[in-house]
């Protein structure tokens, strides 16, 4: 729905959003472990794995490199980075600058860095930004007070999923989830304030 309206530069009506929301339910994902199949219960439903695709690809690429005897590599899939071997400095994109201009950077070694934000894929109508990360409760782009969420941990796939959850739910609900998962984070708010979890306070450099 939103992809179609983005192409036209329009905003879907409330009725269209409510109709789309009526098709959203994780209970409609039917998995058969024996047959190794997945299907959706109702006509008109679709499953978008975009929020975890880069993370999965990065983890698989890293696994293949390790199996091939590679000890030093950097995988960069745009917002999803996996570092192997020597220490590296990874930049965190400034939400209001052109791609490649960092707001800050962190030093990483043998770990993954994943960022979810509203600044790469969006369109504007009457001065309002409509980005691609949707809130499944409202059907509209998430508005939880964050511009970007950067997470650091061993699995890019898991970080991809978790960063999206935190972005949609905001810092107040997201920080306890991060603490429970043992994941460090850099959060950038709507006001461009930067918050780092305790494990990154000495590591993060604001540019």
Description of each model-found segment:
Residues 1-207:
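Mature catalytic core of soluble alpha/beta enzymes
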């Amino acid at each position: 729905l939103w992809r179609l309206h983005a192409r036209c530069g329009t905003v879907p009506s409330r009725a269209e959003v409510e109709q789309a929301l009526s098709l959203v339910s994780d209970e409609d994902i039917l998995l058969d472990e024996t047959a190794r199949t997945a299907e959706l219960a109702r006509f008109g439903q679709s499953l978008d794995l975009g929020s975890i695709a880069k993370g999965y690809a990065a983890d698989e690429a890293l696994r293949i490199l390790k199996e091939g005897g590679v000890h030093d590599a950097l995988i960069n899939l745009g917002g999803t980075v996996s570092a192997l071997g020597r220490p590296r400095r990874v930049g965190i994109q400034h939400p209001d600058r052109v791609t490649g201009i960092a707001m800050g950077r962190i030093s990483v070694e043998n770990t993954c860095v994943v960022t979810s934000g509203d600044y790469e894929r969006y369109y504007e109508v009457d001065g309002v930004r409509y980005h691609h990360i949707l809130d499944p409760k409202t059907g509209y782009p998430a508005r939880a007070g964050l511009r970007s969420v950067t997470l650091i941990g061993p699995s890019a796939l898991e970080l991809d999923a978790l960063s999206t959850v935190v972005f949609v739910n905001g810092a107040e609900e997201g920080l306890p989830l991060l603490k429970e998962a043992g994941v460090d984070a850099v959060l950038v708010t709507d006001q461009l304030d930067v918050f780092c979890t305790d494990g990154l306070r000495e590591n993060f450099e604001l540019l």
